Amino acid sequence: MMTNLMEQCKVLQNASKQLSSMNTKDKNEALRQVAISLQKNESFIIQENQKDVENAEAKGMKESLVDRLRLTKDRVEGMIKGIQTIIELKDPVWKSNEVWTLENGLTVSKMTVPIGVIGIIYESRPNVTVDAFCLTLKSGNGVLLRGSSTSIFSNRALVHAIKEGLKNSDVSEAVISLIDDPDRGLVKEMLTLNEYIDLIIPRGGKELIDFVVKNATVPTIETGVGNCHIFVDESANIDEAVDIIENAKVQRPGVCNACETVLIHEKIAKDLLPKVSGRIGKQVEIRGCQHTQSLIGGKLAIEDDWAEEFLDYIVAVKVVPNVDEAIEHINHFGTKHSEAILTENLSHANQFLRQVDAAAVYVNASTRFTDGSEFGFGGEMGISTQKIHARGPMGLNELVTVKYTIVGNGQIRK
């Protein structure tokens, strides 16, 4: 029996097939119209978002997650700027980087083509609604959105604005579809609709990602939890290290590229830790190892803290004897997201870059840069922590697959 969700996905699938063959000019014009519509609907979007924010606060959601949910004028403007960046990026579809001719005269081309219908399941981050739509449209894919119930008013308003924009273009409104029923049974059904959905990308916490991986029959790409580390080596510039730690922890603690654990070389711990505590200690709860406690006091870290994605004003701090132990700690407790070393030692930097197993590895910079817009992608579908198909921020080039086209003149296989 055809369910309502199946019907919804069938319409989306048909629209995505039409979109897959559209030219770049028409897709870019559609994006331009969506940007105009978002600008026109800015006040309405912020008004609807405020309903979600008030509901979240009433339910006691922690402030770092409320901040992730909140849309401001600047954040809506940021979405619009992101669309312009995507417009300016090269179309990833129907590109051939490899063409060769076989001995029998067949010409083989490896072409990039859209994936088809991409489903994205995400928590209370309404900016994902716009990022996901724009990236899937430019890459020729339809998108099925299932946001959190905590952002339902925001998502409805954003999808309304997107569809209003599409009315002024040659792209069908049906290329975007929102599941706005909070029934969690629909998520489970969505995960098994292989006939209509080609790929599902979950964006959220460990519980959501584990649920999707466990229950999906549709192929998935995990956008993993961000237990991100900063290792401060003995040769690091201490003042620069304090600035980077503050940025990575405090700027937006509720996002996946925020720093959750700081590892400090024992030779500079006495000089660095008081400065870190002085800079962030009033705002951030520091959970330290015994060595850390002996220098700055604070709460003693427990074993679970080393594996925790706090998404809050909490940081775990551990003093380590060398770069080898820092790397071992990161590879044991990390989530393969974003890791950083602060050092003036080129050998240690290269060792860290090669041996740390993560999607993004930094030298002398904040982990906060692991982001599609910061990488110049205009946005992202998520930050993949797996190794197959896509890894790191997923922009346009990660939303296509390949098709081999073979042109002959009557060849038969002997």
Curated annotation (Swiss-Prot):
Pathway it works in: Amino-acid biosynthesis; L-proline biosynthesis; L-glutamate 5-semialdehyde from L-glutamate: step 2/2
First-level EC class: oxidoreductase
Catalytic reaction annotation: L-glutamate 5-semialdehyde + phosphate + NADP(+) = L-glutamyl 5-phosphate + NADPH + H(+)
EC numbers: 1.2.1.41
InterPro entries tied to this protein: Ald_DH/histidinol_DH, Ald_DH_C, Ald_DH_N, Aldehyde_DH_dom, G-glutamylP_reductase_CS, Glu-5-SA_DH, GPR_dom
MF-aspect GO terms: glutamate-5-semialdehyde dehydrogenase activity; NADP binding
CDD domains: ALDH_F18-19_ProA-GPR (cd07079)
Gene3D superfamilies, per the entry: Aldehyde Dehydrogenase, Chain A, domain 1, Aldehyde Dehydrogenase, Chain A, domain 2
Keyword field contains NADP: yes
GO terms classed as biological process: L-proline biosynthetic process
Record keywords: Amino-acid biosynthesis, Cytoplasm, NADP, Oxidoreductase, Proline biosynthesis
GO cellular component terms attached to this protein's record: cytoplasm
Compartmental location: Cytoplasm
SUPFAM superfamilies: ALDH-like
Protein family (similarity comment): Belongs to the gamma-glutamyl phosphate reductase family.
Entry-linked PANTHER family: DELTA-1-PYRROLINE-5-CARBOXYLATE SYNTHASE (PTHR11063:SF8), GLUTAMATE SEMIALDEHYDE DEHYDROGENASE (PTHR11063)
Function: Catalyzes the NADPH-dependent reduction of L-glutamate 5-phosphate into L-glutamate 5-semialdehyde and phosphate. The product spontaneously undergoes cyclization to form 1-pyrroline-5-carboxylate.
HAMAP family, per the entry: ProA (MF_00412)
Name assigned to this protein: Gamma-glutamyl phosphate reductase
Encoding gene per record: proA
